[in-house]
């Protein structure tokens, strides 16, 4: 969809501070240094974000875009991640939202604890922003949270504006600003909000406030751009089989707008962006993650996501350690997953990520490093709620190489050789006393089942009958 042609510019009544110099990204070029001038310049003017209501049957929509909560009392969380990277000033902003046990919208009463046992409840909004600084706002209540059953649309009101009624769905930007003092709303093509740090994270460098408005044009979902988009974890993700489930919603997009970070304004045009989500009873026991949308050495938009973890399968105490590498380049999707090949990893407790993968036709190698100390981020856990559980940086140095696979299994023609100094890197869970090295070890029966091509969405032609989230 041509977002600019379908929407009107949004007016901003608040006076804006001088913007950080982040010039329009009209042509790919070498990455700018991390330090950047704060003085405005006529040559760095950017386009305003534009708003359009989320269309039905939009292109590049992935399965599992919707909110998966089914209304039952089972332990449940859902989390969302949206990232914008600004190459011109080498800064990234990672927005993370979570809801825990939403059955208990006003928190748990004593009677609830007697019946269901103690649970952690609430809604959290976190941002890892410029210079790896952090902000977090949390409430134990989810009564002002909303999520669309079948589309990537959600929001929450922490504090309504002048006694206004909090929105219960997507609203135009001006209406949101008039009704919500502190909160957020996000769709596949629009994102806005304002949050204030609640003081619970003094152990990391903080900012006190963040405000943002930007529009997004999706470029990649999860699959070839001309094909039906894929479920990241296969068709079994439609059922509560894995703990947790995971879906990349937008492997790559281009975002335009502004972010005010503790009063400093960052403006951007066609900035690379990304979104993903997970849901279930709790996070994996241990995991690693690599993601990057800003590269040198390749033309067009390149998107990389690689991750692995130790997660529970089924109802028993069986665990598996799957790994995945997904690359979008020149409109094509290159997938390295357990049910079509192998993925190997060698991950240090911090500072070094090395992965390789192969499938029937291709080979890939990834190596990423960082000298940054990293910032502790929160994740929903069954044991303690939304607590520090992982460490991230957006200043990773990364090299991505991919080849065609020869008949003898060796490296053939090189398809991609690209580098970045803006990779997002993460390790989480634990323990991480030592490095973690291995090759994909997944249950053979599960691999055979997951690898079977099943279009789950086509089994539910009537939207009302589709499982939540699908």
From Swiss-Prot:
Entry superkingdom: Eukaryota
GO cellular component terms listed in the entry, alphabetical order: plastoglobule
Biochemical pathway: Cofactor biosynthesis; tocopherol biosynthesis
Ranges of Basic residues composition bias in the record: 22-31
Primary location group: plastid
Disordered, as annotated region: 14-48
UniProt biased composition (Low complexity): 32-48
GO biological process terms held by the UniProt record: response to oxidative stress; response to salt stress; vitamin E biosynthetic process
Subcellular location field: Plastid, Chloroplast, Plastoglobule
Induction profile: By salt and drougt stresses, H(2)O(2), salicylic acid (SA) and abscisic acid (ABA).
UniProtKB keywords: Chloroplast, Plastid, Transit peptide
Tissues where this protein is expressed: Expressed in the roots, stems, leaves and spikelets.
GO molecular function, one term: tocopherol cyclase activity
Organelle targeting sequence: 1-61
Pfam families the UniProt entry points to: Tocopherol_cycl
Protein role: Involved in the synthesis of both tocopherols and tocotrienols (vitamin E), which presumably protect photosynthetic complexes from oxidative stress. Catalyzes the conversion of 2-methyl-6-phytyl-1,4-hydroquinone and 2,3-dimethyl-5-phytyl-1,4-hydroquinone (DMPQ) to delta- and gamma-tocopherol respectively. Also converts 2,3-dimethyl-5-geranylgeranyl-1,4-hydroquinone (DMGQ) to gamma-tocotrienol.
Note: Plants overexpressing VTE1 show increased tolerance to salt stress with reduced H(2)O(2) levels. Plants silencing VTE1 show enhanced sensitivity to salt stress with increased H(2)O(2) levels.
Annotated protein name in UniProt: Probable tocopherol cyclase, chloroplastic
Organism: Oryza sativa subsp. japonica (Rice)
Gene this protein is translated from: VTE1
């Amino acid at each position: 969809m041509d977002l600019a042609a379908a929407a009107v510019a949004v007016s901003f009544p608040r006076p804006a501070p001088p913007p950080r110099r982040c010039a329009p990204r009209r042509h790919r070029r070498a990455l700018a240094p991390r330090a950047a001038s704060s003085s405005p310049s006529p040559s760095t003017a950017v386009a305003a974000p534009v708003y359009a209501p989320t269309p039905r049957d939009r292109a590049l929509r992935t399965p599992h875009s919707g909110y998966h909560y089914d209304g039952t009392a089972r332990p449940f969380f859902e989390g969302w991640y949206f990232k914008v990277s600004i190459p011109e000033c080498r800064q990234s902003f990672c927005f993370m939202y979570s809801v825990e046990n939403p059955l208990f919208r006003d928190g748990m009463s004593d009677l609830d604890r007697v019946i269901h046992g103690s649970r952690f409840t609430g809604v959290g909004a976190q941002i890892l922003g410029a210079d790896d600084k952090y902000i977090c706002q949390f409430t134990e209540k989810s009564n002002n949270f909303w999520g669309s059953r079948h589309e990537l649309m959600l929001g929450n009101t922490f504090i309504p504006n002048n006694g206004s009624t909090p929105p219960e769905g997507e609203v135009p930007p001006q209406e949101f600003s008039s009704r919500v003092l502190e909160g957020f709303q996000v769709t596949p093509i629009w994102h806005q909000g304002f949050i204030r740090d609640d003081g619970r994270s003094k152990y990391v460098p903080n900012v006190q406030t963040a405000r943002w408005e930007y529009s997004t044009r999706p470029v990649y979902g999860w699959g070839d751009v001309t094909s039906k988009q894929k479920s990241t974890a296969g068709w079994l993700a439609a059922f509560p089989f894995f703990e947790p489930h995971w879906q990349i919603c937008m492997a790559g997009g281009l975002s335009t707008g502004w972010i005010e970070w503790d009063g400093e304004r960052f403006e951007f045009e066609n900035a690379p962006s990304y979104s993903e989500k997970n849901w279930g009873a709790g996070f994996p026991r241990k995991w690693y993650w690599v993601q990057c949308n800003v590269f040198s050495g390749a033309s067009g938009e390149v998107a990389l996501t690689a991750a692995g973890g130790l997660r529970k399968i089924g109802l028993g105490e069986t665990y598996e350690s799957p790994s995945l590498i997904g690359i979008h380049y020149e409109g094509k999707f290159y997938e390295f997953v357990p049910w079509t090949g192998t993925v190997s990893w060698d991950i240090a407790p911090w500072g070094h990520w090395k992965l390789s993968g192969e499938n029937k036709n291709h080979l890939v190698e990834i190596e990423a490093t960082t000298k940054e100390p990293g910032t502790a981020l929160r994740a929903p856990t069954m044991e303690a709620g939304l607590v520090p559980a992982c460490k991230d940086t957006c200043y990773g140095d990364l090299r991505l190489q991919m080849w065609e696979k020869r008949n003898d299994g060796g490296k053939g023609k090189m398809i991609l050789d690209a580098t970045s100094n803006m990779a997002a890197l993460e390790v989480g869970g634990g323990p991480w006393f030592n490095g973690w090295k291995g090759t994909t070890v997944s249950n053979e029966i599960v691999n055979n089942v997951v690898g079977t091509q099943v279009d789950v969405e086509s089994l539910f032609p009537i939207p009302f009958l589709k499982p939540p989230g699908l």
